[in-house]
């Protein structure tokens, strides 16, 4: 680890293989908290490359639990966090909308680290069980079209690193890495990031990790989700080709709204917002979910345009299918209680 830290301190990039070796040392039982902290801070100061991100993500996936699924026709939608927007859980809400529209969503997430409420926190508040087995996850993906993969259970080797991250209280490479380490083999991904300068880097990383299609976006006002507040920046990865474009909500039939209109709160408050959206309540919360779900459906290739994706997302909510996907997961908890 000393050689790696020296190289990073001198602002030298690591090759893919060097990062893989550094990752193996990072996940070793004898690594110290100070070594982890030094690695995270040095890498953040230098700036992450696609090779470094892919190298670390590949080892995290290598040491993750195995999910016994067949095929690769799965999508994940998530943000990196770290944008400081204090918004509600947009991607978690949108995940149920995607499933209601026919996508198979392997929703990979965690408790809050650098934000107020993580996806695991809000789902737990809704009564969705987090401690499901890998076999149950595979079954849920097949029968319900959506399953939640609790990152702490998927990546047991990262427990010590999570502790250091919480102590640091700043965004690190693991904000970027988390969304890249889904143990389910994904065909498509929608990934929102808090740093516009990393759009192409993350898209190249996804290509290196085998994604066929993906969209990486940076929202208006610095959000890690597509925003109604103004123009959003996106990069489409399509079979290895990168296409950058911008998107304003009015271009796809949605009204502009400030980020203050989608503020979240505690896990319980965000759970209530999620339910209001899935039950059909109109307003900026719903429109933000429609925008993000519509982009994800376009990324997947399920629709030809983002506007069409928004229409399909609205149908998913208004038909009740999105809410049914959540209720299916909630019933698992009830069945556990009954025994």
From Swiss-Prot:
Reaction equation(s) it catalyzes: N-(5-phospho-beta-D-ribosyl)anthranilate + diphosphate = 5-phospho-alpha-D-ribose 1-diphosphate + anthranilate
Highest rank taxon of the organism: Bacteria
Keyword vocabulary terms for this entry: Amino-acid biosynthesis, Aromatic amino acid biosynthesis, Glycosyltransferase, Magnesium, Metal-binding, Transferase, Tryptophan biosynthesis
Binding site for Mg(2+) 1: 91, 225
Record: residues binding anthranilate 2: 165
List of residues binding anthranilate 1: 79, 110
Function: Catalyzes the transfer of the phosphoribosyl group of 5-phosphorylribose-1-pyrophosphate (PRPP) to anthranilate to yield N-(5'-phosphoribosyl)-anthranilate (PRA).
Protein family according to the UniProt entry: Belongs to the anthranilate phosphoribosyltransferase family.
Pathway: Amino-acid biosynthesis; L-tryptophan biosynthesis; L-tryptophan from chorismate: step 2/5
EC number: 2.4.2.18
Binding partners and assembly: Homodimer.
Gene designation per UniProt: trpD
GO molecular function, one term: magnesium ion binding
Residue positions binding 5-phospho-alpha-D-ribose 1-diphosphate: 79, 82-83, 87, 89-92, 107-115, 119
SUPFAM superfamilies: Nucleoside phosphorylase/phosphoribosyltransferase catalytic domain, Nucleoside phosphorylase/phosphoribosyltransferase N-terminal domain
Cofactor stoichiometry and binding remark: Binds 2 magnesium ions per monomer.
Protein name: Anthranilate phosphoribosyltransferase
Upper taxonomic lineage: Bacteria, Bacillati, Bacillota, Bacilli, Bacillales
Example GO biological process: L-tryptophan biosynthetic process
Binding site for Mg(2+) 2: 224-225
Cofactor(s) the record lists: Mg(2+)
NCBIfam families associated with the record: trpD
One cellular component term from this protein's GO annotations in UniProt: cytosol
Cited Pfam families: Glycos_trans_3N, Glycos_transf_3
């Amino acid at each position: 680890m000393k050689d790696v830290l020296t190289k990073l301190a001198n602002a030298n990039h690591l090759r893919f293989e060097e990062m893989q070796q550094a990752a193996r040392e990072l996940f070793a039982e004898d690594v110290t908290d100070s070594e982890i902290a030094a690695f995270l801070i040095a890498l953040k100061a230098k700036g992450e490359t696609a090779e470094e991100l892919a190298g670390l993500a590949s080892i995290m996936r290598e040491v993750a639990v195995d999910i016994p699924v067949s095929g690769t026709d799965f999508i994940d939608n998530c943000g990196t966090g770290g944008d400081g927007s204090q918004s509600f859980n947009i991607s978690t809400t949108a995940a149920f909308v995607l499933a209601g529209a026919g996508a198979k969503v392997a929703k990979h997430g965690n408790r809050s680290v650098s934000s107020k409420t993580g996806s695991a926190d809000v789902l737990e508040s809704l009564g969705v069980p987090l401690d499901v087995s890998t076999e149950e996850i595979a079954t849920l993906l097949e029968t319900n079209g959506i399953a939640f993969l609790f990152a702490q259970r998927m990546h047991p080797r990262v427990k010590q690193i999570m502790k250091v991250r919480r102590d640091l209280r700043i965004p690190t490479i693991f904000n970027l890495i988390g969304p890249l380490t889904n143990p389910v083999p994904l065909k498509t991904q929608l990934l929102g990031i808090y740093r516009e300068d990393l759009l192409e880097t993350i898209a190249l990383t996804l290509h290196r990790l085998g994604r066929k299609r993906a969209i990486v976006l940076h929202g208006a006002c610095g959000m890690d989700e597509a925003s109604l507040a103004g123009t959003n920046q996106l990069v489409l990865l399509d079979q290895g080709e990168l296409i950058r474009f911008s998107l304003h909500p009015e271009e796809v039939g949605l009204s502009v709204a400030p980020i203050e209109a989608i503020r979240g709160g505690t896990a319980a408050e965000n759970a209530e917002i999620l339910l209001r959206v899935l039950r059909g309540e109109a307003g900026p919360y719903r429109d933000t979910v429609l925008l993000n779900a519509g982009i994800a459906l376009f990324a997947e290739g399920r629709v030809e345009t983002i506007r069409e994706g928004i229409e399909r997302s609205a149908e998913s909510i208004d038909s009740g299918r999105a809410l049914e996907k959540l209720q299916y997961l909630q019933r698992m908890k009830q069945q556990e209680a009954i025994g």
